[in-house]
Amino acid sequence: MTLKLMVQGTASSVGKSLLVAAFCRIFKQDGYRVAPFKSQNMALNSYITDEGLEIGRAQAMQAEAAGIKPSYHMNPILLKPSSDRMSQVILRGKVYKNISAAEYHQFKPELLKLIKEDFDFLASQNDIVVIEGAGSPAEINLRDRDVVNMGMAEMTNAPVLLVGDIDKGGVFASIAGTLLLLKENERNRIEGVLINKFRGDIEILKPGLKMLEDIIHKKVLGVVPYMDVHIDEEDGSTERFYRRNTEGDIEIAVINLPHISNFTDFEPLAKIPGIKLRYVNKGERIGDCDVVIIPGTKNTIGDLQALKEYRIDKEIFEMRKKGKFIVGICGGYQMLGKVIKDPGRIESTTSEIEGLGLLDIETVIENEKTTTQIKAVIRNNLPSILSPLRNIAVEGYEIHMGQSRILGDCQPFSVITHRNGEKVEVYDGCISDDGKVFGTYIHGIFENREFVREFINIVRKSKGLSPIEEIIDYKEFKEREYDKLADIVRKSIDMKEVYKIMERYRD
């Protein structure tokens, strides 16, 4: 029978997703067939499978670490917040409906059968399934309808490792407090504790670990150091938005929209020597830069209103006057147009809003969501400044509710040739006459090595800088990072004990 291991945390952002990825890689290295699983995920960063189905980005990342293709079975429920009180519910990769938190709480018991079926499918195909919890198991107000923490552990009879984040302080109290709030049968299921994100001399920490073990009557199975690994993160509560690369000939500013989604689009840019990538957060100014990128968003109209409220639109217009490059991805592409219409008020209470007017397109928000993996070719009649991009083949994915229509003589940016493996011929995106402004629906476009190299060299040439000859292969880079992650965690955790724990719970 299949072995199981569940990773729960004392809070959100303690490092559960990365540790699950680490376990997936370790088990793969040890010769096991392994898959990740998270019954319910809340995130704006998502991934499109080969079948055109949408799951949480973290489970796709964990599947990569496990060396397998991402599947909707790994994340049967995905919640994508569209406002403080509403979320889009995605079941098995397809949009179900928009729902309030209160409605969803009542709806959860109906999802148990679906969750169990998807877990059982993965268990039938693999030697080990590594399960990720969400937030904290000690949310006692949600206990009676829990489908993602202890409810999930009990449903699958999985042992639990509890993770605490020492970097933020208060790790001993958070671990002891979490255990205190659990029922006795839930406490008994926790087979060990992991201290994550440790910096400093572990000898100083050891007396505290011994005292903690005496208090909670659980073994600390490992202390994982704060890791400098570059792997896709999932949600927006991340340090990346406040990091600053201090050196670089080319400066790229990404607008951190209130409902920014798929910000992993820009991670490949941060890996290129000579690139200074930064995010423009609320209250900050774009300042002097070479490229402005407006990213994807779960609420295009609401985020465009925020962009105008913070007067970021005025700065974008100023960048346009200065001849800087302005790029829009997905929702950011929609914002660059003349108008965005939402007649059904699907995304907001506003039925129509004026766009930034930098591209001659209009967008209509529709009920039907486009979710596809794509192959495309950059068009061969781009303006001369972008001529190095002509005819470059790219791969990526689409996730959007709206459809954009080109007005006037504005030219498309690319031609989509395949959607979910089927041949098509569909124009994508739009580009200004001078080539300094363009938008596309293609997420992941900067992961294409040739495209990103040529685009960066275009920007470098515009500044009188010499071209870069080669850049990192992002897929190979990620593989090395997964191995690095596994190596660090393997050295930090008592893996022999982890295997023994899993064996004790073998059905």
Curated annotation (Swiss-Prot):
Pathway: Cofactor biosynthesis; adenosylcobalamin biosynthesis. CDD domains: CobQ_N (cd05389), GATase1_CobQ (cd01750). The active site is at residues 330, 443. GO terms for molecular function: ABC-type vitamin B12 transporter activity; catalytic activity. Gene3D superfamilies: 3.40.50.880, P-loop containing nucleotide triphosphate hydrolases. PROSITE patterns: GATASE_COBBQ. Pfam families: CbiA, GATase_3. GO terms for biological process: cobalamin biosynthetic process. Residues 249-451 form the GATase cobBQ-type domain. Keywords: Cobalamin biosynthesis, Glutamine amidotransferase. Transmembrane segments: none annotated. Catalyzes amidations at positions B, D, E, and G on adenosylcobyrinic A,C-diamide. NH(2) groups are provided by glutamine, and one molecule of ATP is hydrogenolyzed for each amidation. Belongs to the CobB/CobQ family. CobQ subfamily. This is Cobyric acid synthase. It comes from Thermoanaerobacter pseudethanolicus (strain ATCC 33223 / 39E).
